[in-house]
């Protein structure tokens, strides 16, 4: 079995391969369980890990919520593991693996919650830079001190990073959803305009009805 271990604090990730005698100790554990890494080997002694997922030998992913070692065929929708939704609202019945670890699991995904005293090469002794920045314009402005009168937030931040980073490869990717936010704002304004128009029409109809049958406004 292979272990895909990640350390989110440092942004590192590394693949390990364990022996059969250590692999057996992981059997019957399920997604979300925490354990001492000492059962996997001396290099992980004192490290607290958590199981986050995995794949079997045929590539079917483990899914939490199904307490079984076997495969199941639940009805999946958009956002569920093991199903990529192509059309809006379409649900499919797909095969996925249960959340309990068994001998049929090929790769197991783990994260380090608390490192031990020993340094793990490539995980706890290394730090990877952030690859993406916040997507919200408000957070970007606060992080880099972008003035309110500045309209091109992405360009302003990119100029700051270029002046600070000698190597352009180290500049993190800037994801900005300003266009999407603008479209959402336009959509909300359009909906509000339609509602106000409907309300105005209803008020006029009510007024005409009262004048016609009750002679009062």
Curated annotation (Swiss-Prot):
CC per GO annotation: ribonucleoprotein complex; ribosome
A GO BP entry: translation
One Pfam family hit: Ribosomal_S6e
One term of GO molecular function: structural constituent of ribosome
InterPro entries: Ribosomal_eS6, Ribosomal_eS6-like, Ribosomal_eS6_CS
Entry keywords, A to Z: Phosphoprotein, Ribonucleoprotein, Ribosomal protein
Family: Belongs to the eukaryotic ribosomal protein eS6 family.
Protein name (Swiss-Prot/TrEMBL): Small ribosomal subunit protein eS6
């Amino acid at each position: 079995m292979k272990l895909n271990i990640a350390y989110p604090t440092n942004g590192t990730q590394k693949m390990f391969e364990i022996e059969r005698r250590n692999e057996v100790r992981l059997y019957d554990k399920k997604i979300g369980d925490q354990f001492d890494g000492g059962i996997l080997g001396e290099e992980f002694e004192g490290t607290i890990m958590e199981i986050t997922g995995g794949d079997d030998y045929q590539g079917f992913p483990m899914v939490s919520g199904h307490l079984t070692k076997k495969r199941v065929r639940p009805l999946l929708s958009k956002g569920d593991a093991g199903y990529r939704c192509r059309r809006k609202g379409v649900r499919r019945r797909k095969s996925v693996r249960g959340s309990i670890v068994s001998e049929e699991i090929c790769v197991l995904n783990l994260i380090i919650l608390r490192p031990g005293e020993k340094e793990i090469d490539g995980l706890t002794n290394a730090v990877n830079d952030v690859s993406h920045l916040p997507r919200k314009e408000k957070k970007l402005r606060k992080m880099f001190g972008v003035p309110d009168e500045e309209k091109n937030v992405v360009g302003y931040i990119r100029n700051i990073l270029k002046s600070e980073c000698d190597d352009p490869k180290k500049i993190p990717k800037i994801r900005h959803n300003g266009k999407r936010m603008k479209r959402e704002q336009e959509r909300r304004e359009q909906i509000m305009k339609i509602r106000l128009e409907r309300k105005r029409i209803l008020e006029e109809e009510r007024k005409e009805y009262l004048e016609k049958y009750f002679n009062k406004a």
